[in-house]
């Protein structure tokens, strides 16, 4: 049985349960490795959980001069290793998803490792085990496609000319017909939508 991690942004209700649970993970030293991002804060309360996407070719590891970031055989990109990490911030700047964070208390880059101590044993990550809306889901592809027939998982992201494939899946509308998430286009669409909404507000004043 191939267990996978899925993020369904449309289901996030901003409750912060995942953030609280993540900080309780034994390997996180009381720090949460997940955070909620406001999609368009000036006009919306919509949030999306931000976890490490565990890239097939992790940029964070590629730019690390100390070879402190390792990827497991099953595709999980791990937190930097303390004896090697020199706190240079290269990984923080290089990640296209903005995930790695430098923890000043430990002089160490720490990030979501998909609760590897749990998932490698077939258990759910802490965040997915407490998410009340199913925005974070750990299970088989067959299960989630059966439960959510209007959505489908994709794990390819386009950043301009760069294509990134990840271990973590993003749920998108099935009728959209997209083969990947065009990140820059989505950001442009968000900006256009915000401008149109603000124009309509001022027109009514």
Predicted regions and their residues:
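Non-ligating segments of multi-cofactor redox enzymes
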Residues: 1-205
């Amino acid at each position: 049985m191939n267990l996978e991690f899925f993020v369904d942004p449309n289901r996030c209700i901003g409750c912060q349960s995942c953030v609280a649970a993540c900080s309780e993970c034994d390997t996180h030293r009381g720090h949460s490795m997940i955070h909620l991002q406001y999609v368009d804060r000036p006009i919306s309360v919509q949030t999306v959980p931000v976890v490490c996407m565990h890239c097939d070719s992790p940029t964070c590891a590629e730019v690390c001069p100390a070879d402190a970031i390792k990827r497991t055989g099953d595709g999980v990109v791990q937190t930097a290793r303390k004896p090697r990490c020199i706190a240079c911030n290269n990984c923080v700047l290089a990640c296209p998803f903005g995930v790695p964070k430098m923890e000043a208390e430990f002089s160490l880059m720490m990030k979501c490792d998909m609760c590897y101590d749990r998932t490698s044993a077939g258990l759910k990550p802490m965040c997915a085990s407490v998410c009340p809306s199913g925005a974070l889901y750990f299970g088989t592809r067959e299960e989630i496609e059966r439960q959510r027939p209007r959505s489908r998982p994709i794990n390819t992201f386009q950043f301009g000319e760069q294509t990134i494939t990840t271990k973590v899946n993003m749920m998108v509308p099935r009728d959209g017909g997209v083969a990947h998430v065009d990140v820059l286009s989505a950001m442009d669409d968000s900006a256009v939508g915000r401008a149109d909404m603000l124009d309509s507000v001022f027109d009514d004043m």
